[in-house]
Amino acid sequence: MLTSGTLMNPKHPVYIISKGRWDSRHTSKALEKMDMPYSIVVEDYEYEQYARFIDKDKILILPKKYIEEYDSCTTDQGTGSGPARNFCWEHALENGATSHWLLDDNIKAFGRINRNLYIHVTSGTIFKAAEDFIERYENV
């Protein structure tokens, strides 16, 4: 495991969309181990459960209007993660971000593969490297 070098975090905000997983919190635990900033988006009725485990400053409550105004283009009852995704996008724009990271709540660890070798990632540097790569191009 490499432990030397400059550690960096992403420039763009990182959001985790979560529902009903306050007990497992895989992605937030992984990001905490990496000392990476993030916000987790939850519905209001689950706020207290998440707040027992996650710093309240990191928790964003999904405004009801995003659920009520969401058109899932289907006859199914649920909206899925669409409302939360739209909220994250608008939240990022309102806070001056030109891009943002949107993560599911079931990621146990982050890593990269080089020459057929899996390397466990221990900082946000990998996100920053991806941003640097993407920002070289105008159509990404």
Sequence positions of predicted segments:
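Conserved acidic residues
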Residues: 12, 98, 139-140
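Conserved catalytic core of nucleotide-sugar-dependent glycosyltransferases
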Residues: 110-140
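Short, conserved clusters of charged catalytic residues that mark active-site
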Residues: 23-26, 83, 125
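N-proximal low-complexity "stem/linker" segments adjacent to membrane-targeting elements
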Residues: 1-36
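A generic secondary-structure signal
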Residues: 29-30, 87-94, 129-133
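Short internal beta-strands
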Residues: 39-43
